[in-house]
């Protein structure tokens, strides 16, 4: 089997890499269709006894020939009052049943994923590949910003670039600052400020 674990903080491109991987595996004829079914706790746990197993089964059915991407799987067991344990047991069973048709990728925070696997040995033994997604450095964040600007057909001068690097460096000192999402929010904020400025100039 090729089931995987992606551990990293939010915004480190885990979902993006999973989507790219699904296309590569389709081209290499490892996967038949190469699509990706993304889900979290709210998509896997039913409200009543017996519902959860059916929901999990339907997700595996939908992912046949592709990847089932389960984000923050540890949240399934964090709330003891729900049917999370039933979801985990069903996932383990379906990983076996669909091992030739579905690749499961579990993703989430490094520490929580480690704990999660320690509590679920049956699950841990079925995961063949562990990929770690480190936080981005200020240089990498600025490079991501450059790519986003290019895609949006914007440019920034060197002075603005230095200011952005400084903002990214400050952000990196914070815990869980958001990585790529932080840069996306920074760019969105800058575009809104620019639009606001242009409207005011036009009115004057």
Segments from the language model and where they lie:
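Hydrophobic positions in the central parallel beta-sheet of the AAA+
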Residues: 4, 37-39, 68-69, 104
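Short glycine-rich substrate-engagement loop in P-loop NTPases that contacts/grips substrate
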Residues: 33-63, 85
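Conserved P-loop NTPase "ATPase switch" module shared by AAA+ and STAND
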Residues: 39-40, 63-82
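Walker A/P-loop
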Residues: 2-34, 58-62, 127
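Conserved catalytic/switch belt of AAA+ P-loop NTPases
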Residues: 74-124
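Conserved C-terminal "switch" segment of AAA+ ATPases
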Residues: 28-33, 115-118, 124, 133-177, ...
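Conserved nucleotide-binding/hydrolysis micro-motifs of P-loop NTPases
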Residues: 12, 43-45, 74-76, 109-114, ...
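Short glycine-/polar-rich loops that comprise or flank the Walker A/P-loop
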Residues: 32-35, 65, 98-102, 123-129, ...
């Amino acid at each position: 089997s090729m089931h995987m674990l992606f551990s990293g903080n939010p915004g480190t491109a885990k979902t993006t890499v999973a989507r790219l991987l699904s296309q590569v595996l389709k081209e290499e004829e490892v996967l038949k269709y190469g699509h990706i079914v993304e889900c979290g706790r709210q998509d896997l746990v039913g409200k009543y006894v017996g519902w959860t197993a059916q929901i999990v089964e339907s997700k595996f059915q939908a992912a046949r020939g592709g990847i089932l991407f389960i984000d923050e799987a540890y949240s399934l067991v964090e709330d003891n009052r729900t049917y999370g344990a039933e979801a985990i047991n069903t996932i383990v069973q379906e990983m076996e049943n669909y091992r030739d048709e579905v690749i499961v990728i579990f993703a989430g925070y490094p520490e929580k994923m480690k704990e999660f696997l320690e509590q679920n040995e049956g699950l841990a033994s079925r995961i063949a590949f562990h990929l770690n997604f480190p936080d981005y450095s200020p240089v990498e964040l600025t490079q991501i910003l450059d790519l986003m600007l290019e895609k949006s057909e914007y440019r920034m001068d060197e002075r603005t670039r230095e200011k952005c690097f400084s903002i990214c460096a400050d952000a990196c000192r914070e815990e869980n600052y958001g990585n790529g999402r932080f840069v996306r929010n920074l760019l969105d904020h800058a575009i809104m400020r620019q639009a606001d400025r242009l409207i005011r100039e036009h009115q004057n």
